[in-house]
């Protein structure tokens, strides 16, 4: 008998500190950087974002989202076989121990539960979900916790108006479990390392020092142009694998990078924005957390219902992109 995977539960978490555009404008003005609510909103669709407290780590955000997802699925951490965490802002310099291992400990999961991180920036959750699905299909694991969590505020240059107004912190999680009926229908992952410089943190660490900038940089125009192109391509690819057409998709749950990218992708897919889950206005770009955050919000709002077909897609630094078609 074939083994499939399905989403059994979802959860999300946002840090307590919420900054509206005006809050951020006033904060930046104190450092001599000028911007405006209108400038931010018209270019990105963002009205607010959340920032982690100084003592909050990526694992703390991930833990809250994970606990909510476990509760939603009706299981406990002792039921888990594997934890996969997508992040570009791990707890530890160098990325080890993995933030997934930290979350495993904080959850109280047993040592039989494997744990590791994946890193594909804003496409990270699609990579993590596709990996979890593959593990379940092989019969290796039955219950996998998949998390996307970021504290991007830690790597923002608050003298760079083009990036510091766009990003926020948060976490989202799903419990993926083995099923006799298909839930995840198809996945597709891609990367183009030749485009690595258009969205990156250029600095490198060595001998106890950081060489180059420790903050993210972005060529916004290049990212926009490439993102819309590859998102359309991977969406068609993953739908073809699932034998679905765009009109059969009930909800598009995209990476919440920028309202213009989401509108551009929906238009190319021939989909109305009424069928797109949009949270970027309240969350900003939360990188690997954005898709599971949007998914959980769509479910909790009652928009997304069991039995509906969803298309998840994301694109990020690397350049990396991916998509997942599923029946919720």
From Swiss-Prot:
Top-level EC class: transferase
Main location: cytoplasm
Sequence segments annotated as region (ACP-binding): 256-260
InterPro entries per the UniProt record, alphabetical: ACP_syn_III_C, ACP_syn_III_N, FabH, Thiolase-like
Disulphide bridges, residue numbers: none
Lineage: superkingdom: Bacteria
Any Pfam family hit: ACP_syn_III
A biological process from GO: fatty acid biosynthetic process
Active site: 122, 255, 285
Catalytic activity line of the entry: malonyl-[ACP] + acetyl-CoA + H(+) = 3-oxobutanoyl-[ACP] + CO2 + CoA
GO function term, MF aspect, one: beta-ketoacyl-acyl-carrier-protein synthase III activity
GO cellular component, one term: cytoplasm
Keyword match rRNA-binding: no
Keyword Lipid biosynthesis annotated: yes
Its biological purpose: Catalyzes the condensation reaction of fatty acid synthesis by the addition to an acyl acceptor of two carbons from malonyl-ACP. Catalyzes the first condensation reaction which initiates fatty acid synthesis and may therefore play a role in governing the total rate of fatty acid production. Possesses both acetoacetyl-ACP synthase and acetyl transacylase activities. Its substrate specificity determines the biosynthesis of branched-chain and/or straight-chain of fatty acids.
HAMAP family: FabH (MF_01815)
NCBIfam families associated with the record: fabH (TIGR00747), PRK09352.1 (NF006829)
Subunit record text: Homodimer.
Name this polypeptide is given: Beta-ketoacyl-[acyl-carrier-protein] synthase III
Source species of the chain: Polynucleobacter asymbioticus (strain DSM 18221 / CIP 109841 / QLW-P1DMWA-1)
Lineage: Bacteria, Pseudomonadati, Pseudomonadota, Betaproteobacteria, Burkholderiales
């Amino acid at each position: 008998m074939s083994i499939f995977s399905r989403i059994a539960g979802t959860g999300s978490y946002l840090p307590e500190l919420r900054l509206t555009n005006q809050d951020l404008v006033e904060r930046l003005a104190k450092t001599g950087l000028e911007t405006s609510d209108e400038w931010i909103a018209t270019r990105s669709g963002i009205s607010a974002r959340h920032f982690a407290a100084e003592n909050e780590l990526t694992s703390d955000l991930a833990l809250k989202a994970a606990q909510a997802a476990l509760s939603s699925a009706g299981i406990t951490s002792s039921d888990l076989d594997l934890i996969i965490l997508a992040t570009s802002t791990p707890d530890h310099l160098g990325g080890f121990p993995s933030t997934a291992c930290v979350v495993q400990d904080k959850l109280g999961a047993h040592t039989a539960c494997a744990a590791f991180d994946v890193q594909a920036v804003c496409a990270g959750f699609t990579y993590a979900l596709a990996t979890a699905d593959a593990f379940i299909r092989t019969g290796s694991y039955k219950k996998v916790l998949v998390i996307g969590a970021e504290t991007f505020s830690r790597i923002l240059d608050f003298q760079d108006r083009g990036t510091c107004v766009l990003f926020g912190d948060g976490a989202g999680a799903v419990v993926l479990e083995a099923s006799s009926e298909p839930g995840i229908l198809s996945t597709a992952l891609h990367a183009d390392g030749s485009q690595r410089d258009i969205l990156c943190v250029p600095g490198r660490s060595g001998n106890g020092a950081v060489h180059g900038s420790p903050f993210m940089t972005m060529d916004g125009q290049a990212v926009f142009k490439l993102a819309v192109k590859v998102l359309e391509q991977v969406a068609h690819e993953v739908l073809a694998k699932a034998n679905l057409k765009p009109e059969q998709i009930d909800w598009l749950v995209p990476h919440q990078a920028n309202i213009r990218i989401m509108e551009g992708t929906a238009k190319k897919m021939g989909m109305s924005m009424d069928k797109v889950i949009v949270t970027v206005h309240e969350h900003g770009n939360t990188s690997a957390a954005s898709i599971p955050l949007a998914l959980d919000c769509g479910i909790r709002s009652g928009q997304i219902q069991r039995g509906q077909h969803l298309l998840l897609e994301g694109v990020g630094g690397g350049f990396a992109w991916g998509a997942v078609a599923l029946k919720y």
